[in-house]
Amino acid sequence: MKLSMVMVLLVLAGQLSGCGGNDDNNSERTHESGDSNGDVTTPDNDASSNDEDDAALEPTQLRSVEFAQSHVLPPGGLSWDLKESGELQLVEKRDTLVLATFDEAVQAAEVRVYDKNHQLLSSLNLSKPSDLPPTEGDDLPYSDDAWSAVIPSDDMSKGVNIRVVAQGKSASEIVTPALHPELDLTIQSLPFLIYGANESNIPFKIDDLKVMFADPDTAGQGFAGMPFSKTHIVNHPLGVFESDYLIAPPSGSAPAKKVESAADPDYSKPILDMVWHIEYATGDMALNKITFAPSMLIDHSKAGPIKTRGFGGMAYTGSGASMGYPSLGLLWHEGGHALGLPHSLSGSKDLRGPYYPYAEGSLSGSAWGYDQHKGYFRSPLTAPTSRYFVCNGERGGGVFQKTPEGRCYRFDPMHSADEQKDPDAAFPLFSDFNAGKMQRWVRNRARMNPSNDGFQVLDDNGDWADFVPETKHYAGWHIKEHYPVSFDKTTDFIMITYSLAGTDAASHFYNPIRYKGNAIEYVDAINQDGLNSINADISSGARAKYSDYCRRQGCDFTLKVTYEDGSTSYRVLKGSARKDWQPSVWKDDYLNENSKDSYLFWAVALVAPDGAPKVKKLELLDTPILWNLSPTAVMGAEALVVKQL
């Protein structure tokens, strides 16, 4: 019986590409089978009374069944025998288009949707093939014989299964699609307005940058194109970061410097690190959130009212941190990096891989997409209405892949951001492979619990379960694995730069930003128990609770914050210029102003005291080998950098 189930599924899967019009299937994509990962089975006696009523009729014979959310998938989803790949499956709690084709002519049909206990949830009339959704750019239809219906999101839960009933027939075999659990992604937009950027000298409205142009139509398309139950594009809790200058770190051949115009060649250099620190300090780096910083950088040497200097974008792969010029194509490209995606072109050619299955970083071999917001399919071929419909040679080093008829395939957004879509489409189409990798990234992150005061992670059964983070490795890397410990509280975000070499203008506090949100844990520098917890002396064999907190790179500085009501807060600044695991030994080049070892950067998200008084003064205190100091010594330490507000 097990063998026959698998054989039936493989027969169905083998015909899906012909139904979809995709004529290049020489990929390493495989169709999954098995009882728990999407299956086609014969009816049992528990299905439903509806099915028992027509049991005397001949069963409906299906040629294929597919499901579409962001992509059109076989019941078992898709997987790849490649390094670092994911599994692309349907997700719970999302409207799902079901597509059915038959072995014989039918006049009418319905799909019956059941829960995991075989209780009927919905009976949906299937629309005729003539009513199938169109294709982006008025391209060729996905199918000329597929019947379709939309399964509502409430019905899409673990164990859901369907049976199709053609007029005059009994129900088909049971089809059980593989489902990932409910997966959500939040994309946070944090505009960086630098060197005097304002609405008089930039080409965009700041309110639009705060949500990356996500009006209802754009937000709907963003959700539709991502393989998640929900995708939110929102303004970051910090709102906007504004500064008339940036501090560029030492380059190795030149010292740190204060940059005050985008005319400087290092005009955008510090931003990505700043975004990374924001992700880290707020605790977002552990969660299902990414941050994109649309950056407006003013070049004061430019004539005319608009003085922004253009550039591309950057991200730390898999970190959740990204930045770039404000465009939806770059949001998808740099956001893709933040979600763990490398460049598709290099991934397809990497001799250690490949890490991307389709030639030249293209969509040749990828499944069709489906945009439920626009109500159309998206072919892996370049849309006829694209300016790249007629394509020759290469694009950015990637050779255009073509069908035998000369049609060009799109490149994945991780190679070419947005040129091959219909002009009315907001976002490019990700390959099925990269969609699966993004699902894997989100499945490996925690999410906030429903009350927004704790966390959930996926357990071994694939269900969301409550999770309490613990500190590992004596806090050598993080306390409580850099999960937030305060939630939705009034908080001040503070960034500090400091040159150990005394480089002019390189030691600064950026203006603090008050926001309402989350923050990770910091050590109180004037609490004796806190100081004891980070004691890095392990010579006796005994270890403090957080003994490696300072052992990795030292703890030599303290942040002091004074509020308008006279109250103060002191926090240990983790990280200095000490040698790894030698917290009392300076690095060799710590006084060389051209060396990166001479430059320190910290970010702290500090919960405001009761009553939320405003910050009045910021100070960087000199507290070498901090764990050996007393609270009194910390409070009396010299201030190296002071900012009055």
From Swiss-Prot:
Pfam families: Peptidase_M66 (PF10462). Its cofactor is Zn(2+). One of its GO terms (molecular function) is metalloendopeptidase activity. Residues 19-55 are annotated as: Disordered. Residues 177-448 form the Peptidase M66 domain. Zn(2+) binds at H333, H337, H343. GO terms for cellular component: extracellular region. It is found in: Secreted. The active site is at E334. InterPro entries: Dictomallein, Peptidase_M66_dom. Binds 1 zinc ion per subunit. It is an enzyme of class 3 (hydrolase). The keyword Metal-binding applies. GO terms for biological process: proteolysis. Residues 1-13 form the signal peptide. Keywords: Hydrolase, Metal-binding, Metalloprotease, Protease, Secreted, Signal, Zinc. Its EC number is 3.4.24.-. Belongs to the dictomallein family. PANTHER family: DICTOMALLEIN-1-RELATED (PTHR39540:SF1), PTHR39540. This is Dictomallein-like protein. The gene is dtmL.
